[in-house]
């Protein structure tokens, strides 16, 4: 039986010979692909885009609608033609592409960011 790490939520600790490759490892790889080296296209788009490409990521703002409703401050990642959501940890960094800013996640939400 695996355990879950408290930082990225990755599964680990399978006993020797136990197969964790299927659902456990797939979830790990998808999470790593979504949050490592994080950049998002936008953070103030309240309606999910109509034709997102797989790999597109957004920070969900307050007052988001549709499938993003109730996901404020989460990372919405388009994977296999569906949205997956990841809750950032305090200190997570994200490059906001349309603003050319680097933002940090704090207890109050995402910072305004620094132009880079």
Q: Where are these predicted regions, by residue range?
A:
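Short basic/aromatic-enriched segments
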Residues: 63-77, 84
């Amino acid at each position: 039986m695996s355990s879950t790490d408290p930082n990225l939520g990755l599964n680990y600790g399978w006993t020797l010979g136990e197969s964790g490759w299927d659902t456990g490892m797939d979830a790990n790889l998808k999470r790593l692909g979504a949050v490592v080296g994080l950049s998002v296209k936008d953070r103030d788009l309240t309606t999910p885009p109509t034709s997102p490409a797989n790999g597109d990521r957004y920070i969900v703002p307050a007052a988001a609608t549709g499938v993003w409703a109730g996901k404020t401050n989460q990372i919405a990642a388009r994977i296999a033609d569906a949205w997956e959501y990841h809750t950032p940890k305090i200190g997570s960094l994200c490059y906001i592409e349309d603003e050319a800013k680097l933002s940090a996640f704090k207890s109050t939400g995402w910072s305004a960011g620094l132009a880079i």
